[in-house]
Amino acid sequence: MGKVCVCGSVNMDVSGYVERLPAPGETLRGSRLVYAPGGKGANQAVAAARLGADVRFFGTLGDDRFGETLSAALAGDGIDLGGLRRCDDPTGVALILVADDGENQIVVLSGANDRVEAPEPDPDARVWLTQAEVPLAAVEGTLAAARETGALAVVNAAPAGRLPAGLVARFDIAIVNETEIEALGSHLPPNVVLTLGAAGARIVPDGPSLPALPAEVIDTTGAGDALAGGLVAGLAEGRPLADALRLGLATASLCVERYGCQPAMPTRPEVDARLA
């Protein structure tokens, strides 16, 4: 399997679990509070690593207790942290509410993620992956690093509207949901993976639609990151895009059956069993 390089965010997820999501101005009583490693970039890196990919991560943490915890978590999944920097800003935090039906609301406090820099090229990289939770220069630098060595360049253009559509169009593959693809308009890369939640995903413009795998959903927070990590792991194996997407969908179907993001990412034997 080829190497996957991920340039992205890393946060401490602070998740509160509630019966339902609150209305504006409403106070609800929650059932439990969980601290867990998160951040779109780190989540996707962990998802790929647990599927057997050789992963190198580029990001920035604060010089604080959360930073120590998150660095140790990434190292525990065998991820190369040679591109992980420290800065004086606090480590990023995501405040998450999760309802009993699995739906969620998320507020991200970027902190040190606003200091992520353009990554250095890696001659062994087969796939580069980035997202919209880091500065524009880091996203542009990820594309440049991929182009320098002929690697595939993949962008998860989330959250919506954070990246110029013209920049997204220069990547080989974009992973977007229905809101994010609307924000891009007609500026699309050659291949777009359109995620459709419980309906699965579709390869735009001319690829197949693939159904979601059956799952007992309890928390959808990490579903998109699981899909992205599974997808790039498949691409690093040399799979065609549709086959890589199937791997991503299987990864997501297992993730939503567990609480949290990184702790919920499945192993390769689990994903292979789901696909069998």
Residue ranges and their predicted role:
Residues V4, D54-V55, L81-G82, A153, ...:
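Hydrophobic anchor at the start of a short beta-strand
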Residues R126-N191, A198-A201:
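Conserved beta-alpha-beta core of the PfkB/ribokinase-like small-molecule kinase fold
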